[in-house]
């Protein structure tokens, strides 16, 4: 896409590396901060925290172990952030790597359109007892819910935490499960 047809985004995207940055700026008119992969340092964390006070921060990290680790590390420092998720199936055909730079244009655009806002709260919107009532005992049920929310897969404790960060109530989750 040329500069005239790139989609304008509000906020700053946080991604892992320079190839991710180049790929995102090829499609979107947006500022990008890179973490330099798993070499995320306190200086970069402080920069992201400062930016988050003034404009939306969008975490757009690879769907691999390193990307999940960076995401968890940044989540600890941010009170509010937006998050995009891409799946392994969203990679370009014949791609040997799995990441933002290797995802299809359509997958990147869709992930940004379906991004979720996460907010730390002192009062959970969903209790552990309510969560257990949802009967998300099987991985397939949790995966189906994660897919409806455009999230990567999470285990029980992680999903419970994410649902609260999304500020979803018991009734809202029940509606999603129908």
Swiss-Prot record:
EC top class, as a word: hydrolase
Highest taxon above the source species: Bacteria
Annotated positions binding Mg(2+) 2: 62, 64
Alphabetized Gene3D superfamilies for the sequence: 3.40.1360.10
Biological processes per GO annotation: rRNA processing
InterPro entries for the chain: RNase_M5, RNase_M5_C, TOPRIM_dom, TOPRIM_RNase_M5-like
Keywords: Cytoplasm, Endonuclease, Hydrolase, Magnesium, Metal-binding, Nuclease, Ribosome biogenesis, RNA-binding, rRNA processing, rRNA-binding
EC number annotated for this UniProt entry: 3.1.26.8
Record-level Gene Ontology MF annotations: metal ion binding; ribonuclease M5 activity; rRNA binding
Cofactor note: Binds two Mg(2+) per subunit.
Residue ranges annotated for the Toprim domain, each copy included: 10-103
NCBIfam families: 5S_RNA_mat_M5
Record family assignment: Belongs to the ribonuclease M5 family.
Function: Required for correct processing of both the 5' and 3' ends of 5S rRNA precursor. Cleaves both sides of a double-stranded region yielding mature 5S rRNA in one step.
Protein name as catalogued: Ribonuclease M5
Lineage, broadest ranks: Bacteria, Bacillati, Mycoplasmatota, Mycoplasmoidales, Mycoplasmoidaceae
The gene coding this protein: rnmV
